[in-house]
């Protein structure tokens, strides 16, 4: 018999071989980012905590690189007063090799030790800590580095000690940043207002105010990372607004108080819509309209209903617009799903997308799939991410997959300027994205905690408990009930198949036509619940029955906030609204991709032409998944828009301070629609010439490279002079 110790060693050797192969393809920063993502997958699903961990890991990687950099890139934490925490650093004591290869090796070693120490500290108590610790040990072995080296004396021992020192300092800072890490991020003031909901039992289990959040209590609970929960999870991070951010500023802050607790509201979205339970209303009521749309979209989760959609970029497009909260019905297609912009004037779906792929000049191919498959796949893909690393980690995975890997060796900041070495581009990209994701968590959860808004499972079941609100002469009338719509929401009568459902008299209750829920799935590998009539007080979101809905309030949508911020940031980072090559794809194989139930019924690829297309799909997925109504989505997008842009511009002042100042003063100049108008004043004149001359001869690309030769030279000057003193169209 082979002993367990030998099995572990054998596994480590195999993993070391795989890690070594990976190292030949990815930078050290990329490898350690993957280790953080894997640690997240092995932990509980805590988006706020993981956004902070990704941000802190990115700070360490960047500062380890910047400490050895001889250009004007600045450190963000090392040697700085970081939000009141001083991280001392004697830069004269650090030996910086003059040889470029030796300098890069020092950067890689420092990154490795810093990342190793941070992951050990942050994930040592995670449910799969043994796996995570094994992974990072194997990573260290693959790099032939000693895990037992713990010195922080960088003057004596150089790079490995610098990595240890930085991690030690950042871990200490983390105890002061308002996250309450020392008490495992426990709530410091918030108290739940409403009783827990027991979804396995019909109704809401005693919900009094339908505008407030309920915790989900289950007989058997597993979170979105697949971890077994032994008790009902409390609200995650209701006072996360207290955490120190990256690019958040006092001008973004509103201070508020509720129920004896103070809240920092960042980018305050204002109040959501509320239900007045004493006033009659139909679906013209904004609260009922919002939650009614969640039921309506639940009806789409049937791949056999005959509705086929072309989900290719030639059919679907998102232009980045965000509706006002009082004008949502002009943006979302309540009955048929998706955006109103996806339909023509006659109500026909599709054909409103991108005309051609700008990189190939060819039209995008059609991608016909059942609407029920598309809706189910995106609900699961974006719920867990490409591999269960929570929404902040989703976007690191997409950055890694399509940009850092896809464009290795060709990186240019903003798509302009000289080619940047992969390691430098990776650490700078991670810092910008990490800062944005961290600020998103702070801003979105500050609203979640203060507004304490209910989830659809509570709202829909609450209306169902109260009956119908359409006709006082019909049974079970109440102003707070569900409005009746023939064929969609009806009353159970004596002849109804549901009249004695569950061995109880159900006549007079309200039924809805929607996804039937987990009660109709015995074996998820082979069963599909489908769409049919169910009792409305038994409505389920399209999620695992052991999860149901996230353990925090709904307003605003974290997915919408994270995804919009990431899209804004990646547009700026790459200098293009399009994914590299004009297309990013993720495969959903037939009968293998879905976890909640069997499916999809055919193999297909999710496809996005632009970063905005992907962010929009992420946001909409939460409505098909039954997790958010539109009122949660639109304000989240708006917050994400501001956070993503602010985070990128702030990161740029750190990672490229000389270029950010030299080329336009507020970051690099964006590629202009009006060729030659570099300062954006609507004409080509002396101000543009001054900016042009600062880039002349520097190998700069982007708006100054008028003839697209990857250099700014005499031919570009001649082209600019031909445009001189002419207005933009």
What are these model-predicted stretches?
Residues 1-4:
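N-terminal secretory signal peptides that target proteins for export/translocation
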Residues 666-729:
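Cellulosome-associated attachment modules in secreted, modular CAZymes
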Residues 19-23:
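Sec/Tat signal peptide C-region and signal peptidase I cleavage site
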Residues 24-672:
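Acidic/polar surface patches and capping/hinge elements
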Residues 6-17:
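Bacterial N-terminal signal peptides
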């Amino acid at each position: 018999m082979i002993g367990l110790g030998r099995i572990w060693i054998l596994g480590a050797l195999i993993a070391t071989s795989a890690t070594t192969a990976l190292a030949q393809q990815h930078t050290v920063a990329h490898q350690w980012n993957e280790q953080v993502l894997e640690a997240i997958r092995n932990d509980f699903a805590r988006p706020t905590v993981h956004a902070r961990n990704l941000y802190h890991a990115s700070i360490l990687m960047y500062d380890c690189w910047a400490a050895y950099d001889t250009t004007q890139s600045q450190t963000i934490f090392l040697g700085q007063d970081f939000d009141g925490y001083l991280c001392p650093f004697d830069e004269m004591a650090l030996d910086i090799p003059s040889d470029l290869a030796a300098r890069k090796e020092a950067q890689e070693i420092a990154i490795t030790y810093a990342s190793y120490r941070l992951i050990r500290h942050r994930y040592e108590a995670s449910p799969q800590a043994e796996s995570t610790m094994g992974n990072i040990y194997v990573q260290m072995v693959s790099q032939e580095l000693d895990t037992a080296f713990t010195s922080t004396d960088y003057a004596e021992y150089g790079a490995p000690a610098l990595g240890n020192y930085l991690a030690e300092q950042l871990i200490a800072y983390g105890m002061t940043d308002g996250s309450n890490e020392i008490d495992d991020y426990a709530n410091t003031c918030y108290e739940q207002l409403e009783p827990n909901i027991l979804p396995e039992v019909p109704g809401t289990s005693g919900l009094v105010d339908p505008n407030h959040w309920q915790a989900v209590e289950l007989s058997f609970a597993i979170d979105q990372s697949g971890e077994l929960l032994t008790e009902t999870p409390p609200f995650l991070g209701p006072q996360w607004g207290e955490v120190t951010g990256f690019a958040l500023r006092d001008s973004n802050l509103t201070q508020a108080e509720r129920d004896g607790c103070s809240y920092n509201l960042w980018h305050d979205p204002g109040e959501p819509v509320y239900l007045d339970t004493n006033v009659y209303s139909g679906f013209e009521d904004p609260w009922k309209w919002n939650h009614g749309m969640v039921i309506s979209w639940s009806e789409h989760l049937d791949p056999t209903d005959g509705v086929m959609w072309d989900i290719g970029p030639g059919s679907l497009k998102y232009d980045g617009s965000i509706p006002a909260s009082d004008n949502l019905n002009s943006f979302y297609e309540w009955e048929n799903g998706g955006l109103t912009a996806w339909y023509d004037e006659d109500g026909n779906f599709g054909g409103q997308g991108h005309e051609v792929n700008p990189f190939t000049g060819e039209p995008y191919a059609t991608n016909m799939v059942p609407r029920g498959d598309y809706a189910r796949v995106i609900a699961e893909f974006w719920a867990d991410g490409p591999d269960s690393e929570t929404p902040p980690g989703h976007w690191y995975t997409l950055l890694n997959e399509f940009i850092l890997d896809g464009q290795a060796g060709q990186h240019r900041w903003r798509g302009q300027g000289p080619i940047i070495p992969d390691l430098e581009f990776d650490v700078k990209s991670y810092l910008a994205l990490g800062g944005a994701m961290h600020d998103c968590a702070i801003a979105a959860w500050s609203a979640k905690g203060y507004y304490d808004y209910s989830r659809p499972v509570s709202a829909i079941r609450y209306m169902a408990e109260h009956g119908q609100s359409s006709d006082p002469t019909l049974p079970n009338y109440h102003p707070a009930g569900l409005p009746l719509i023939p064929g969609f929401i009806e009353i159970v009568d004596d002849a109804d198949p549901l009249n004695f459902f569950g061995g109880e008299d159900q006549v007079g209750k309200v039924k809805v036509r929607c996804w039937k829920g987990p009660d109709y799935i015995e074996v998820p590998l082979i069963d599909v619940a489908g769409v049919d009539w169910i009792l409305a007080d038994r409505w389920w979101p399209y999620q695992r029955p052991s999860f149901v809905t996230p353990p925090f309030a709904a307003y605003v949508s974290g997915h919408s906030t994270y995804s919009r911020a990431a899209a804004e940031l990646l547009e700026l980072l790459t200098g293009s609204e399009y994914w590299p090559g004009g297309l990013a794809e993720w495969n959903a194989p037939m009968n293998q991709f879905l976890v909640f139930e069997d499916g999809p019924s055919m193999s297909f690829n999710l496809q996005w032409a632009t970063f905005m297309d992907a962010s929009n799909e992420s946001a909409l997925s939460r409505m098909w998944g039954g997790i958010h109504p539109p009122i949660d989505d639109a304000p989240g997008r708006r917050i994400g828009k501001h956070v993503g842009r602010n985070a990128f511009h702030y990161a740029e002042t750190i990672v490229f301070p000389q270029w950010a100042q030299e080329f336009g003063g507020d970051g690099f100049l964006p590629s202009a629609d009006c060729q030659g108008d570099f300062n954006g004043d609507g004409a080509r004149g002396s101000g543009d010439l001054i900016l042009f001359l600062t880039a002349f001869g520097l190998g700069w690309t982007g708006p100054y490279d008028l003839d697209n030769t990857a250099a700014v030279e005499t031919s570009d000057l001649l082209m600019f002079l031909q445009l001189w003193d002419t207005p933009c169209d």
